[in-house]
UniProtKB/Swiss-Prot annotation:
Protein name from the UniProt record: Shikimate dehydrogenase (NADP(+))
InterPro entries from the UniProt entry: Aminoacid_DH-like_N_sf, NAD(P)-bd_dom_sf, Shikimate_DH, Shikimate_DH-bd_N, Shikimate_DH_fam, Shikm_DH/Glu-tRNA_Rdtase
SUPFAM superfamilies: Aminoacid dehydrogenase-like, N-terminal domain, NAD(P)-binding Rossmann-fold domains
Gene symbol of the encoding locus: aroE
Listed Gene3D superfamilies: Leucine Dehydrogenase, chain A, domain 1 (3.40.50.10860), NAD(P)-binding Rossmann-like Domain (3.40.50.720)
Amino acid sequence: MKLFGLIGEKLGHSLSPEIHNKVFKDNNIDGLYNLFSVKKDFENNIVESLKCLGVKGANVTIPYKEKVMDQLDIISHEAKVIGAVNTILIKDGKSYGYNTDYYGFGKMLERAKVNIEGNSFFVLGAGGAARSILKYLEDSKAKKIVLVSRDKEKAFKKFKDFNINFMSYGELEEINEEFALINTTPCGMYPNTNSVAVSEKVIKKFKVAVDIVYNPLETKFLKMAKDNGLKTVDGLFMLVGQGVKAEEIWNGIKVDKSTEEEIYEELKCRF
């Protein structure tokens, strides 16, 4: 039996086992997916511990996505640029790090038939969640990428390696019509479901609204967007997509789209 798992600090609410167990079943993989709750005292020994336990692959969540990078032998290009690893492969005694949030975001937009190349994207929030999204938009030839932050100068220092523009929320109020608005802030996430990062006036200026929050599935941001005729994309398929990509890395397989859809539909019932 192959051993896999999720590494983090507080993991009681994780949906990851359901994603991975479905992939195991549909692809006849004899696998076991565990939750590994790691205390901060042991954060410097994560990769070594995985090797000792015979773990073949692991997902990594907060607060260890950055800390684990120093412990890896090889890190993928996208993970280096993003500055975070959320997937580890142990193979032939070596450890490899990837960022599958990058691929999960891409899968989510592809499924929703949102074209990136030649279009403009405004990204709300300058936290860690924005990095994989900015990198994917850059690599996919978006015409214009604008990061919207409460502190524009701080955001510029933090994201200066990206070929993007910067804007304050006040400046966002004055823009003309654009293509897509992406929320990477925790606004609207349970239990603060009544919060939204931008005004309805701003939302009306876009054609597409994307929210990486998936609890609830339809945030106040997406509800406002839908009511104003925008195409809306919820964040649940990004979660599914990043998990599926991890499985493809670990097991050298190509997961069928029907499996992805079944996982999405099963998880959707939770919210």
